[in-house]
Regions:
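Membrane-interface interhelical connector segments
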Residues: 35-49
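Extended, low-polarity transmembrane helix blocks
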Residues: 1-32, 53-60, 64-140
Length: 140
């Protein structure tokens, strides 16, 4: 067992780090909504003429799916819910800014939700890896 062969080239370790990072960071957003409510999202939905109860779906994508990603529990299924949640977030909050650059930072305005979205997409295609709770099933 060598450092380079067994550790530095371990794709499964990379998938674990991706799951922990994407799921862990999104969990903060979800817990904030869980403890303080989804009124902000409900207001955005109301302005779009949509029912406000749909805002509770963000808890599914930001709390439940994030915890599943962290644990590696049905990773592919969790990742598609997670990514779908981010598509909705981008469409609701950034649809008018898809081609905008932040003048203060020079960054793309929707870059953070896009990073979360792509993290979910990658995990959907790869699965959770060897260090996941569930492995080998269609939802894993």
């Amino acid at each position: 067992m060598t450092l380079q062969k067994d550790f530095l080239r371990d794709n499964n370790l990379g998938l674990l780090l991706l799951r922990l990072t994407v799921g862990g960071l999104m969990l903060f957003h979800g817990l904030h909504k869980l403890f303080y409510g989804v009124g902000f999202i409900g207001g955005m939905l109301s302005q779009m003429g949509l029912p406000t109860w749909i805002a509770y779906g963000s808890l599914l994508g930001e709390v439940v799916a994030s915890l599943m990603l962290i644990a590696g529990l049905w990773t592919r299924a969790a990742a598609i819910v997670f990514a779908g949640n981010m598509v909705v977030a981008i469409l609701m909050a950034h649809i008018g800014q898809l081609f905008a650059i932040d003048p203060m930072t020079g960054g793309w305005v929707p870059e953070l939700p896009m990073l979360y979205l792509m993290g979910g997409v990658v995990l959907f295609f790869t699965g959770g890896g060897r260090y996941a709770l569930t492995r080998g099933g269609i939802a894993d």
